[in-house]
Amino acid sequence: MLTFRKIVDFYIHSSIHVGVAVFCLVQLSVPQWTSYSFLVFFGTVVGYNFLKYSEWFFTHQFFRIQYIGILVVTLISALGFSLLFLQQDATVQLNLILAFGLVVLYPFVRKIGWLKPFYVSFVVSYITLFVPLKSDVDVIVLFVQRFLLLSSVMIPFEILDSSKDAVAMKTLPHCFGIARTKQIGYGLVGLF
């Protein structure tokens, strides 16, 4: 049981679950198993780990034994992302560079707490829907639907994290209260 717990902890801390979730969203848009789906998986793991562990990446603390597995997963994902990125056509590469710019802006957007879930939903929708289906006529409708779905799914996590987040962050629960934040989530689901 202890081994299973260690595996689950590693799976969660290395952000593989986030990569799998975003991979699945790409598969909803483009059902065939394309290199783009795996590119997004690897890119998500790298980007999420970089944002999550950025303060440790630049210190000697990160090279402690408990972080080595996460570092290895991140480096393998970076290699996979790089190789698959080079296989994409120029339009996809340009769109991914734009998405990378949006990810780099995330730490600044995070300071505007109430905007964070909507920003993340926009970036994930852009990567999982707009880039692979940019020429599809229904892409705008699908994009709005995915944005509403992702925003509503993030609301419970915003509420859960509200006890840990500083009030100065002004997250949705801090700005509107938990009951009103739930109503916002219900409204987003209704619009979806």
Feature locations, PLM:
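Short, amphipathic, aromatic/basic-enriched membrane-interface segments that mark the entry/exit
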Residues: 4-15, 60-70, 87-90, 110-117, ...
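The first (N-terminal) embedded transmembrane alpha-helix
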Residues: 8-28, 118-127
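Helix-coil boundary and interhelical linker segments in multi-pass alpha-helical membrane proteins
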Residues: 20-40, 80-94, 128-144, 192
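Alpha-helical membrane-inserting segments
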Residues: 25, 29, 47-54, 102-105, ...
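Membrane-embedded alpha-helical segments that form the functional core of polytopic membrane enzymes
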Residues: 30-50, 97-101, 138-156
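Solvent-exposed interhelical
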Residues: 40, 44-75, 151-189
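Intramembrane alpha-helical segments
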Residues: 63-135
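Functional transmembrane core segments of multi-pass inner-membrane proteins
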Residues: 120-163
